[in-house]
């Protein structure tokens, strides 16, 4: 018999009754029933009930066992007594009568329990992550992640893609966040950077003639902590294709992402035909470039109904041509209590409040706004936005560039409060026609709005002749249930157009050559049209596992202060290490 086990703890069935076996694993829990000890033994594969009675030679040692001891036990498989089956366990019809126990690894007092669903402070869980990972739900999440990545690989290979690994030590580039820098010992004063994404390398692969690339790529960004992003590193399904249009990328990737969701959705419906929503439309209808389309509410502009009306606050605002009034329909929300609750919520979000109209029996509008603008305008609003008796609508006014995010939050809040958002499905969509540039208020200059390597719609001609803030890019996102889960674009592969695109954003040609020398050189020697995307593995796994915390689907994540509490990173370097790297630490003044 094998030194440690003949079977795993999830393998034994009724067909094994009568066999002498050996198991190894962790003591999940010990129960004493009238002097007979029941030991639940657990490993990666499952759990088996083991029985030790006072007649067993192993009894004296079994009495000393505690949770999370690692043990080996020999025994005989037998049928559980009638009425004691556990249908929740694959091994629930059998048990092991134990004849011998060996302790392989004793366990001290546990800083957090493995058995049970008790909530513990996150810092404790991260410091003792090896214990946390033994807990059933987290262990399942990690294995679901493994299977999702396997599914992604299988589907990408089925679409004719080849998996390549790109360098981890590379050059710094402006991807939109700070780089993690690595000092070079061999080249004093110079630094490598960990890749924020394999963007340039995957484009270089297309110029090298490999046609279709993918990898599960680690990416590193030195960003301030955010609730929807893990600090430090994350993983993406990175993709690039040669000789393709935007439609070709969509046709290749929709079945991959849809297939992964269908495989792991646990029966929840997954949208078959993805909607394509222009960026500007997404902001206007949903107040977000990653709208939750499970919520049926669509906002509408209703400025004309308030222009010159008796509601002077909105009427005066609309004298400025850039200002608008948007309506957020609230089906079933026509009660004073709900409207007051939404008003209080808005004030908690730093807003002066939310104007509203409720529609009573007979279609009569009620509330301060309705009283100020009169029945004719109230009826016209109702007709435009399609509400009925018992419904309400909330109104947001001002410069849409400044209020669209809040209006999106209000739409989400209404959907949640009125149970309009269907939580039992996955709604996928493409967001298209992103602006190529945006105005950076802090730096008072035009800047790239997203990926600087995207092809502008209209090409070089648009870059030379259009107002930069009106240029759209061949750039797209995939959204699911209010999350951006992928982003991509058709690349700007024309050297002159690349230089012009960066020039508009304030980069001179020499700076482009210096910072993107490898790719710029490659463009001079025959670059194919190409495009691709990157899908966030972590967010996809998070959605499919039904959690909202990325740490619940990651093996060894950092905390929100970007600290690895298990390994003690970041840590100070020794004087010797710093000298070898020719680096001096200049700490900020306290």
Swiss-Prot record:
CDD domains: AspRS_core (cd00777), EcAspRS_like_N (cd04317)
Domain of life: Bacteria
Known EC number: 6.1.1.23
Gene Ontology process terms (BP): aspartyl-tRNA aminoacylation
Key words of the record: Aminoacyl-tRNA synthetase, ATP-binding, Cytoplasm, Ligase, Nucleotide-binding, Protein biosynthesis
Region Aspartate, residue ranges: 199-202
Site (Important for tRNA non-discrimination): 33, 83
Reaction(s) catalysed by this chain's protein: tRNA(Asx) + L-aspartate + ATP = L-aspartyl-tRNA(Asx) + AMP + diphosphate
SUPFAM superfamilies per record: Class II aaRS and biotin synthetases (SSF55681), GAD domain-like (SSF55261), Nucleic acid-binding proteins (SSF50249)
Annotated binding of L-aspartate, by residue: 175, 221, 450, 491
Subcellular location per the Swiss-Prot or TrEMBL entry: Cytoplasm
GO molecular function: aspartate-tRNA ligase activity; aspartate-tRNA(Asn) ligase activity; ATP binding; nucleic acid binding
Binding site for ATP: 221-223, 484, 536-539
GO cellular component assignments: cytoplasm
NCBIfam families, sorted: aspS_bact, PRK00476.1
Physiological role: Aspartyl-tRNA synthetase with relaxed tRNA specificity since it is able to aspartylate not only its cognate tRNA(Asp) but also tRNA(Asn). Reaction proceeds in two steps: L-aspartate is first activated by ATP to form Asp-AMP and then transferred to the acceptor end of tRNA(Asp/Asn).
Homology family: Belongs to the class-II aminoacyl-tRNA synthetase family. Type 1 subfamily.
PANTHER family: ASPARTATE--TRNA LIGASE, MITOCHONDRIAL (PTHR22594:SF5), ASPARTYL/LYSYL-TRNA SYNTHETASE (PTHR22594)
Oligomer status and interactors: Homodimer.
Protein name: Aspartate--tRNA(Asp/Asn) ligase
Organism (species): Bradyrhizobium diazoefficiens (strain JCM 10833 / BCRC 13528 / IAM 13628 / NBRC 14792 / USDA 110)
